[in-house]
Design a protein with these regions (language model features):
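A structural signal for multi-pass alpha-helical bundles of membrane permease subunits
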Residues: 1-213
Length: 213
């Protein structure tokens, strides 16, 4: 077929799966398997940390009563009005100051970025936890359960839909992100994720080798 990113036709002239094979076997110019593994590692660890933070904070806001509860909830709502990338310049310099913008620290830096503010996104899970009858928690406490046991053995099993939703969103956010990866990783192709690698496929030295071939 025609080479390049743009062609004269909309539908492909022939059906082939060779490009999927090439994507994982031809690594001389762009190493897709490495980018895929980088993305998978970052997404899995970010998902684990974020899910733990979100569900824990949601339970605290739903079931516990403490002095700064309302101000914290209001602050979290206000912070949620601003997109995360507004802070990326400050975040970059903080990471640079602690040495996480070079080498293997880049993966850790991205995991920290995606996980750090996840706890403020607790409103949806909190709303679901609010629907679980408090009488069940109170009965468990009377039977000798502590707060962790109530959370782990009663609330979570009754909240499987919101747990699955939290896991999916916590995984997809780093998997699909481009802006922070572009700023933090930059030209260091060893630590590219899939989104950054796909973006670089459009560079003039790569475009003819990957599109409509």
């Amino acid at each position: 077929g025609e080479g390049g990113a743009y062609t004269k036709y909309f539908f492909p002239e022939q059906l082939t799966f060779n490009n999927y094979k090439r994507l994982f076997t031809e690594t001389t110019l762009l190493n897709f398997p490495r980018a895929f593994m980088n993305t998978l590692i970052i997404s899995i660890f970010s998902c684990m940390i974020s899910t733990t933070f979100v569900l824990s904070v949601s339970y605290c806001m739903s079931r516990l009563r403490f002095k700064m509860r309302k101000p914290f909830m209001n602050l979290a709502m206000i912070l949620g009005l601003f997109p995360a990338f507004m802070s990326m310049v400050a975040v970059y310099f903080i990471l640079k100051a602690i040495g996480l913008t070079e080498g293997s620290g880049l993966r850790l830096a991205l995991i920290l970025i995606y996980s750090a503010g996840s706890g403020t996104g607790f409103y949806i899970a909190k709303g679901f936890f609010d629907t679980v009858p408090k009488s069940m928690s109170e009965a468990a406490i009377l039977d000798g359960c502590n707060q962790f046991q109530v959370f782990y053995r009663i609330i979570l099993p009754l909240s499987k839909p919101i747990v699955v939703y939290t896991i999916l969103t916590a995984f997809l956010a780093p998997w699909l992100d481009f802006v922070f990866v572009r700023v933090i990783v930059g030209p260091k192709d060893k630590y590219w994720t899939v989104s950054l690698l796909l973006y670089n496929m459009l560079e003039k030295e790569f475009v003819n080798g990957w599109f409509t071939r």
